[in-house]
């Protein structure tokens, strides 16, 4: 779950990290009033969306008058911002962040992720701030400096100083950087984050460090113990199908193809998408119904898949372990009858009571194609899409 920039900076303030004074606004009038609260300009106005590349798309602007602030807010509020990180529809702009402009002397980068290879939280710092860190890692990886946090000791001040020295910082900037490093690490660990990023972390012309931007990604599996973060969730920034799936504890990710996929188990779901592509098809989604594939969840899964107008056929791939395939077949039949599926449905059942499940599907009288194997299922669903 991602947070907006203004929400990230609210967290920074709670942990004593330096950031520009700013206010999130939902109307042009609020934006003008925010400028008055901040004081004399210039100001910076920023569209609040869960995507990078806002500046290049016109979603960030330095302004010198309240009239410019109002014009920016009127232009963007209620509209959609399209960046290189969004799809063609963009993300809705419901808030504008108005904050004091900062005199920038130099831009740095500081961020952290969970590194699965080392199984630790790893901090990354670079002198190449203001640029996508992925681009820096690809083109100039030697400019990224890393430290890993020991899970027993947590972050240590010497690690912050080590990164500061590698960035060429001196004097009070080393102390300021170390404080920011320790604060970010504390936020990361206490708030169960998967990602934290300040890009850019700037050195002002007055010789101080300021968190000019903030990006936070929370671990969705830990939100049950982070109620304040859970309340910050902005579902308008999420794919509505993904949000609906989450309510039913379905793992759904929208893709660009035309073959809907419903599978139990994440690994099997990825394998299913691979074999669909191997036979010339394009998956429309990743959908893992999990071990409790009840009729209700299967019905909801069908509704979510078919809400995508691009879907021309559905492939259901179920491995019956604890779950019996005949019960899954009952759920599929009931779901198809209730939802009114008007596209071909190919079902592959394997495992516990698979033969009985296949017989129920065959006897249902519905437009359900029972596949004999995963390869057969992939071939049949691709053929169905092609009208063969």
From Swiss-Prot:
Domain ATP-grasp residue range list: 9-244
Q: Which InterPro entries match?
A: ATP-grasp (IPR011761), ATP-grasp_succ-CoA_synth-type (IPR013650), ATP_grasp_subdomain_1 (IPR013815), Succ-CoA_synthase_bsu_CS (IPR017866), SUCC_ACL_C (IPR005811), Succ_CoA_ligase-like_bsu (IPR005809), Succinyl-CoA_synth-like (IPR016102)
Is this entry keyworded Glycosyltransferase? no
Cofactor(s) needed by this chain: Mg(2+)
Gene3D superfamilies assigned to the protein according to its UniProt record, in alphabetical order: ATP-grasp fold, A domain (3.30.1490.20), ATP-grasp fold, B domain (3.30.470.20), Succinyl-CoA synthetase domains (3.40.50.261)
MF terms per GO, please? ATP binding; magnesium ion binding; succinate-CoA ligase (ADP-forming) activity; succinate-CoA ligase (GDP-forming) activity
> Per the record, what are the reactions this protein catalyses?
succinate + ATP + CoA = succinyl-CoA + ADP + phosphate; GTP + succinate + CoA = succinyl-CoA + GDP + phosphate
Disulfide bonds listed in the record = none
Provide the residue positions that the database annotates as binding ATP: 46, 53-55, 99, 102, 107
Q: Does the keyword Translocase apply?
A: no
Binding of substrate: at which residues?
264, 321-323
Q: Show the GO cellular component annotation of the record.
A: cytosol; succinate-CoA ligase complex
The EC number on file is 6.2.1.5
Which residues does the annotation say bind Mg(2+)? 199, 213
Q: Which keywords does this Swiss-Prot/TrEMBL entry list?
A: ATP-binding, Ligase, Magnesium, Metal-binding, Nucleotide-binding, Tricarboxylic acid cycle
UniProt subunit comment: Heterotetramer of two alpha and two beta subunits.
The family line of this record is: Belongs to the succinate/malate CoA ligase beta subunit family.
For this entry, the protein name equals Succinate--CoA ligase [ADP-forming] subunit beta
């Amino acid at each position: 779950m991602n947070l907006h920039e203004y929400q990230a900076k609210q967290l920074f303030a709670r942990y004593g990290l330096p950031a520009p004074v700013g206010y999130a606004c939902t109307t042009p009038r609020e934006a003008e009033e925010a400028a008055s609260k901040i004081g004399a300009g210039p100001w910076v106005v920023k569209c609040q969306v869960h995507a990078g590349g806002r500046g290049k798309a016109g979603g960030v602007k330095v302004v010198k008058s309240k009239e410019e602030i109002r014009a920016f807010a009127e232009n963007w509020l209620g509209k959609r911002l399209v960046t290189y990180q969004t799809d063609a529809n963009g993300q809705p702009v419901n808030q504008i962040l108005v904050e004091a402009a900062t005199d920038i002397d130099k831009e740095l980068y500081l961020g952290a992720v969970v590194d699965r290879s080392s199984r630790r939280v790893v901090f990354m710092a670079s002198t190449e701030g203001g640029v996508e860190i992925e681009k820096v890692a690809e083109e100039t990886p030697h400019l990224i400096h890393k430290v890993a946090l020991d899970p027993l000791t947590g972050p240590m001040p010497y690690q912050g100083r080590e990164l500061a020295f590698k960035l060429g910082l001196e004097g009070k900037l080393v102390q300021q950087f170390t404080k920011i490093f320790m604060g970010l690490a504390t936020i990361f660990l206490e708030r169960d984050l998967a990602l934290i990023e300040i890009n850019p972390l700037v050195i002002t012309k007055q010789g101080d460090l300021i968190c000019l931007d903030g990006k936070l990604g929370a671990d969705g599996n830990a939100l049950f113990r982070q109620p304040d973060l859970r309340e910050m969730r902005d579902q308008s920034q999420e794919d509505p199908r993904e949000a609906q799936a989450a309510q039913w504890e379905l793992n759904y990710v929208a893709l660009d193809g035309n073959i809907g996929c419903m599978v139990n188990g994440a690994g099997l779901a990825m394998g299913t998408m691979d074999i669909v592509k191997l036979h010339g098809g394009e998956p429309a989604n990743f959908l893992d119904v999990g071990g409790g594939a009840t009729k209700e969840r299967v019905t909801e899964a069908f509704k979510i898949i078919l809400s995508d107008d691009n879907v021309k056929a559905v492939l259901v791939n179920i491995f019956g372990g604890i779950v019996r395939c005949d019960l899954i077949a009952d759920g599929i039949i009931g779901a198809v009858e209730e939802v009114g599926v008007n596209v071909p449905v190919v079902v592959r059942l394997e495992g516990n009571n698979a033969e009985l499940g296949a017989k129920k599907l065959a006897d249902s009288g519905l437009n359900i194609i029972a596949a004999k194997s995963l390869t057969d299922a992939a071939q049949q669903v691709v053929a169905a899409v092609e009208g063969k």
